[in-house]
């Protein structure tokens, strides 16, 4: 997400979030000088929400709908600042970058190290794998290097086909439409992106060994 970007639209609120906000305002009016125990307050709100009828909840659901419309409208007009990660979304259909010979070696030997040393941290595991890899002879490394070369060759063919397909589809569509509506799936995309980044970072750490 665009951390620190003051122009980024405020996130949309759920019907329950509006309900909690209303409860908080009511509590402040009744007890202006008393502090709120957040955990206890949240529990009470949750219990109260469960006992409410659909008719009582509809007021908050309407508020959530109008806030969602506001958010979608603002996101369509929102332009992320240059360098913002969300400006270049990863296409889930894009071919995945091939692993290196070392990464293939790690994938094969990591489970063994984890079973032998269950308390070992990720960093220490990566370090141990790096040491093991450096101790391998050129002959022992060869199967991994051959497999990595084949995967790289396949990736290069796949990415060329993917890019060619992207260009032809862009030509058919003509001038691009605003893609702000895609932002609805932003939290899920972020999680995927973070997972992929964790993998990439681990691979980079291992390559440095």
Curated annotation (Swiss-Prot):
Tissue spec. comment: Expressed in gastric and intestinal tissues (at protein level).
Biased composition (Acidic residues): 187-209
Domain text: Both, HMG box 1 and HMG box 2, show antimicrobial activity.
Gene Ontology terms for molecular function: chemoattractant activity; cis-regulatory region sequence-specific DNA binding; damaged DNA binding; DNA binding; DNA binding, bending; DNA-binding transcription factor binding; double-stranded DNA binding; four-way junction DNA binding
Residue(s) carrying Cysteine sulfonic acid (-SO3H): 23, 45, 106
UniProt keyword list: Acetylation, Chemotaxis, Chromosome, Cytoplasm, Disulfide bond, DNA recombination, DNA-binding, Immunity, Inflammatory response, Innate immunity, Nucleus, Oxidation, Phosphoprotein, Repeat, Secreted, Transcription, Transcription regulation
Entry-annotated residues carrying Phosphoserine: 35, 100
InterPro entries assigned to the protein according to its UniProt record, in alphabetical order: HMG_box_dom (IPR009071), HMG_box_dom_sf (IPR036910), HMG_boxA_CS (IPR017967), HMGB (IPR050342)
Known DNA-binding region: 9-79, 95-163
Function: Multifunctional protein with various roles in different cellular compartments. May act in a redox sensitive manner. In the nucleus is an abundant chromatin-associated non-histone protein involved in transcription, chromatin remodeling and V(D)J recombination and probably other processes. Binds DNA with a preference to non-canonical DNA structures such as single-stranded DNA.
Family in the record: Belongs to the HMGB family.
Compositional bias (Basic and acidic residues): 52-76, 107-117, 137-150, 162-172
Binding partners and assembly: Interacts with POU2F2, POU2F1 and POU3F1. Component of the RAG complex composed of core components RAG1 and RAG2, and associated component HMGB1 or HMGB2. Component of the SET complex, composed of at least ANP32A, APEX1, HMGB2, NME1, SET and TREX1. Directly interacts with SET. Interacts with LEF1.
Chain residue ranges for the region called Required for chemotactic activity: 165-180
Subcellular localization: Nucleus; Chromosome; Cytoplasm; Secreted
Name of protein: High mobility group protein B2
Disulfide bonds: 23-45
Modified residues (N6-acetyllysine): 3, 30, 43, 90, 114, 141
PANTHER family hit by this protein: HIGH MOBILITY GROUP PROTEIN B2, HIGH MOBILITY GROUP PROTEIN DSP1
One Pfam family linked to the record: HMG_box
Post-translational modification: Reduction/oxidation of cysteine residues Cys-23, Cys-45 and Cys-106 and a possible intramolecular disulfide bond involving Cys-23 and Cys-45 give rise to different redox forms with specific functional activities in various cellular compartments: 1- fully reduced HMGB2 (HMGB2C23hC45hC106h), 2- disulfide HMGB2 (HMGB2C23-C45C106h) and 3- sulfonyl HMGB2 (HMGB2C23soC45soC106so). Acetylation enhances nucleosome binding and chromation remodeling activity.
Sequence segments annotated as region (Disordered): 52-150, 162-209
Single GO BP term: double-strand break repair via nonhomologous end joining
Gene Ontology cellular component terms for the protein in this record: chromatin; condensed chromosome; cytoplasm; extracellular space; nucleolus; nucleoplasm; nucleus; perinuclear region of cytoplasm
